[in-house]
Amino acid sequence: LILITFLRKEEILKGDSTLVDDVPPHKKSEKTGCLPNMTKTLKSNYIKLLEKTKNLVTLNSAASILHWDMQTKMPPKGIQMRSLQLAMLSRFSHKMITDPEIGRLLKSTLKHPEYDSLDPIQKRNLYLIKKNYNEQTKLPEELVVKITKQQAITIDVWKKAKATKKFLKFKPELEKLFKLKKQAAEILMKVKETATPYDALVDIFEPKMSSEAISKVFKELKDGLTSLIKKCETSPKQPDTSILNHPISTKTQQKIGKLLAEFIGYDVTTINSGGRIDETEHPFTTGYYDDVRITTHYYPNRFASSIFSIMHEGGHAIYEQNLKKEWMFQPVGEACSMGFHESQSRFVENIVGRSREFWSYFFPKLKKMTNRVLSDLTLDNFVYAINHVKPSKIRIEADEVTYSLHIIIRFNLERDLFAEKITIDELPQVWNESYNKHLGVSIENDSKGVMQDTHWASGLYGYFPSYALGNIYSGQLLASMEDDLQDWRTQIAKGDFINVKQWLIKNVHDYGNLHNPKDLIKIISGKELDVKPYLNYLNEKYSRLYEF
């Protein structure tokens, strides 16, 4: 999970890419100030708009740190004050983005006779500022403040309810937040001209993507995954996953995590580091450019959990840290979408982190750091165990084959909630029925069911589809990368992640928010959003592991 800053919660959205051609960003002008021939008025307007955006980003980055503190260091009694602090910051943020002067500056700039002299990056900045302004001016300030305050309260109650396994403790606050988010979604639906309120929320995280389009893509994905799962389950060759239950102390897991971070180039140890790893109930990433923080959760008898959550969140972190420094504080300096964000985290976690090549390098280090606790494990048995395909109850611990089914279930529930086909009161029952139907597992309590994720407590409705879309993007990215780096697996086996990381920087991170996701994936892969490369990757990998 990338914990969205207020900048994204308040919808600095990604817009129509027709303003931008398909020239790679490193071949464009990287200065987004003013062109030499820009008139004084046009230049002045553009600079003022960027200054206002910088102020907004700076304020919202402070809010994101308060969110981080709330889930990592804040004492339990601090929640009431923290909710007031965040509510006040959201009020200031809303006032800043809805400042009438922004409207006047945009109108003057967009109608200026020399507007066409601006380069594509400048036009994209203006487009995104305008889109955000138009949408935010329609949201009442008091509604924005209420949502922010309720989010803080709901997250706090969620933690306590999850610990006691009682949804009834969580339900009242969740209902309050859902009603507020639905109210906002209904307003945004009209502004964005989406088909449904839920589509308006999906658009925040995956611009120009509708629930109807997602449903079609997810059907193809589900059909392919269901077939593969059956092949894995019926294979006579099955791994021994009990080897992953060796007790490893939290202190040792922390050391392992730092070494993993070092491998992917996420610095959490030097005096010039721009990251850190902390412990929370639910892993997340937050921050901006040079201060990007990740969290994980340590289980003494499930050490692999923190390994892969750190790889996952680390993938998010290196995306944020490697966005163009020249674009910092500008709308184009944001990530493309949450789907692309998840493509980076899933790529690092699974395509790299669960590969045999990576573990041929890292496994000896793991055994050494655990003081021979894992001495009875072999590389082959370990790699097989961490890639075991088995339907499970917990999303963040699911294998990469069944994982997307967890997302499809959540997507269906969210869509039905906003369509009023189900209610918050019915969520636990429908959740349990869905898990039994699609994954064949029984949920014994709500902590392992409807309350396992932080997203709904955080008001992040519409985010879940990004995970499965990220998987699909990662498959297309892999296919493209293999054309450029045929020996990437050999490099990983030698402990060298540099060329893979540089490929991701050049082909994903460098583009920032210059394009919509549907256009960016086509620029990178030459194809529209396509499930086949991801399914091909999975089938090739697991047919080798399970020998079918």
Regions found by a protein language model. Give the residues of each.
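C-terminal, non-catalytic "cap/extension" segments appended to globular domains
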Residues: 40-45, 61-64, 77, 81, ...
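Divalent metal-coordination and catalytic microenvironments
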Residues: 49, 189, 312, 345, ...
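A well-structured
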Residues: 34-210, 514, 532, 539-548
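Active-site recognition of the HExxH zinc-binding catalytic motif
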Residues: 305-324, 342-346
